[in-house]
Amino acid sequence: MGGGRWAAAGALLALAAGLLAAGSASEYDYVSFQSDIGAYQSGRFYTKPPQCVDIPADLRLCHNVGYKRMVLPNLLEHETMAEVKQQASSWVPLLNKNCHIGTQVFLCSLFAPVCLDRPIYPCRWLCEAVRDSCEPVMQFFGFYWPEMLKCDKFPEGDVCIAMTPPNATEASKPQGTTVCPPCDNELKSEAIIEHLCASEFALRMKIKEVKKENGDKKIVPKKKKPLKLGPIKKKELKKLVLYLKNGADCPCHQLDNLSHHFLIMGRKVKSQYLLTAIHKWDKKNKEFKTFMKKMKNHECPTFQSVFK
């Protein structure tokens, strides 16, 4: 996302600069749009006045968005930084899929809004462009576009956060999926940890066979060792079968050679256990070894799913 991300952030900051100049102020420690947010968010009002705070380094979704300070409460009714971090962490794996050039700007305009004298929401067309590009990727993981980001909530003709002219978004849409998204993962220790935290279960697994079934890939394990059981009951472990959702016809190169052990992560959707990430279990790989060390002591944030 490199250049596109910074260009998008620059557009957002240009808007911010213009609005700040109009308000004859250079920086707001306390901003004055409490009643506006309350009116927009179903009449909800907050006990503390909105304030500008630094975007912390561990708010991975927005730390490098291009500006350094944000408003709390944010535009999704999160009143504390702990709540923002918990909810935002579930979006980091999607951001890494690069499904749309505007994903980070759109999400951060809500999770970590730039400090202005009134709330500025993302443009409806930006929401629709990100949704249309990213929801097909989300569906591989058993997710749909969440109610809290419903695009008709956002302004159409008013001042709003935009990164490019509306007709330029078409060029940034992916031209079809080449690799099954759960198989297209960066082999970096931090990225694997993020996937682990966003997944409900994790297993070390030897795979017996892979079949096509009803548009999915069906993965039959041979041997498995739980690293994180989550919703899997011990009695279910013996007969466990995994599915790569909508993956019947997209390649997953890790599954081309089943002689290795794998790190498999996933989540339960209804009665199915879906694969959300797969890596070759490679102790010789430096990044994988780093992940193994971090995993022993790493505490994932606990959060209620924002996708329900």
Swiss-Prot record:
Q: Cross-referenced SUPFAM superfamilies, in alphabetical order? A: Frizzled cysteine-rich domain, TIMP-like
Q: Its GO CC terms?
A: extracellular space; plasma membrane
Q: Which residues form the signal peptide?
A: 1-25
Q: Domain named FZ: which ranges?
A: 47-163
According to the record, glycans are attached at 167
Show where the NTR domain sits: 180-300
Where, by tissue, is this protein expressed? Highest levels in aortic endothelium, heart, spleen and eye. Lower levels in lung, brain and kidney. Weak expression in liver, skeletal muscle and the medial layer of the aorta. In the cortical brain, localized to neurons and small blood vessels. In the retina, localized to the inner and outer nuclear layers with high expression in the neuronal cell bodies. In the heart, restricted to myocytes. In lung, highest expression found in the epithelium of terminal bronchioles.
- Which InterPro entries does the record match to this protein? Frizzled/SFRP, Frizzled_dom, Frizzled_dom_sf, Netrin_domain, Netrin_module_non-TIMP, SFRP1_CRD, TIMP-like_OB-fold
The GO molecular function terms of this record are:
frizzled binding; Wnt-protein binding
What CDD domains does UniProt report for this protein, alphabetically?
CRD_SFRP1, NTR_Sfrp1_like
Biological process terms from the Gene Ontology for this record are: actin cytoskeleton organization; canonical Wnt signaling pathway; cell differentiation; non-canonical Wnt signaling pathway; positive regulation of cell-matrix adhesion; positive regulation of focal adhesion assembly; positive regulation of stress fiber assembly; regulation of angiogenesis
Q: List the disulfide bonds.
A: 52-115, 62-108, 99-134, 123-160, 127-151, 180-250, 183-252, 197-300
Compartments annotated for it: namely: Secreted
Which Gene3D superfamilies does this one have? 2.40.50.120, Frizzled cysteine-rich domain
The Swiss-Prot or TrEMBL record describes its family as follows: Belongs to the secreted frizzled-related protein (sFRP) family.
What biological function has been recorded for the protein in this entry?
A: Soluble frizzled-related proteins (sFRPS) function as modulators of Wnt signaling through direct interaction with Wnts. They have a role in regulating cell growth and differentiation in specific cell types. SFRP1 decreases intracellular beta-catenin levels. Has antiproliferative effects on vascular cells, in vitro and in vivo, and can induce, in vivo, an angiogenic response. In vascular cell cycle, delays the G1 phase and entry into the S phase. In kidney development, inhibits tubule formation and bud growth in metanephroi. Inhibits WNT1/WNT4-mediated TCF-dependent transcription.
User: Assembly state and interactors?
Assistant: Interacts with WNT1, WNT2, WNT4, WNT8, MYOC and FRZD6.
> What's written under domain?
The FZ domain is involved in binding with Wnt ligands.
Q: Which protein is depicted?
A: Secreted frizzled-related protein 1
For this protein's source organism, the top of the classification is: Eukaryota, Metazoa, Chordata, Craniata, Vertebrata
